[in-house]
């Protein structure tokens, strides 16, 4: 991240481009046919203290992934569902991942729940393939958790909570 890794002569944008291009070089080294996905947190959570990527970083990462046929998977378990002023943190870079994982904001502390959201293309591949997505956890598909998540999303969107988060975030 920029605090420790940015050279004195670089702007934050230049730093972001330099480290994003490290992905391009690694994909070239390995061969794009050997790289399935790039996984990252748009806002690094527990290991760094809620630090977002520098502007432009994820836009370049998206371009690199698209150019090489590599999926972009974003982990928004901690930062997603309104916690950054947009429904998803990645929206602030005007990109969309192929797969995004969300959790904590989805239940808003009322009920533990998580979700994996994917593009229509990935969904169709699963549906038209085996039609089965293998996963399993004790509380998977719990109706109370799903109802709580629906209620959280309703309030978040209907009560303009995202606008309030953006305003308060700018103030803080």
Question: How would you name each of these model-derived features?
Answer:
Residues 1-172:
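Conserved N-terminal phosphate-binding loop of PLP-dependent enzymes in the Aspartate aminotransferase
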């Amino acid at each position: 991240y920029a605090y420790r890794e940015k050279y004195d002569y670089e702007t934050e944008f230049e730093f972001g481009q330099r480290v994003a291009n490290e992905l391009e070089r690694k994909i070239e080294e390995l061969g794009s046919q050997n790289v399935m996905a790039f996984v990252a947190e748009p806002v690094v959570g527990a290991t760094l203290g809620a630090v977002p990527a520098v502007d432009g970083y994820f836009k370049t990462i998206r371009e690199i992934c698209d150019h090489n046929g590599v999926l972009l998977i974003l982990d928004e378990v901690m930062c997603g569902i309104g916690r950054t002023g947009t429904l998803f943190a990645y929206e602030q870079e005007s990109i969309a991942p192929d797969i995004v994982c969300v959790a904590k904001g989805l239940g808003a502390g009322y009920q533990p729940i998580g979700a994996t959201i994917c593009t229509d293309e990935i969904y169709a591949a699963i549906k038209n393939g085996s039609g089965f997505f293998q996963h399993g956890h004790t509380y998977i598909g719990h109706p109370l958790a799903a109802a709580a998540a629906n209620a959280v999303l309703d309030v978040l969107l209907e009560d303009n909570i995202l606008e309030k988060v953006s305003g308060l975030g700018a103030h803080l």
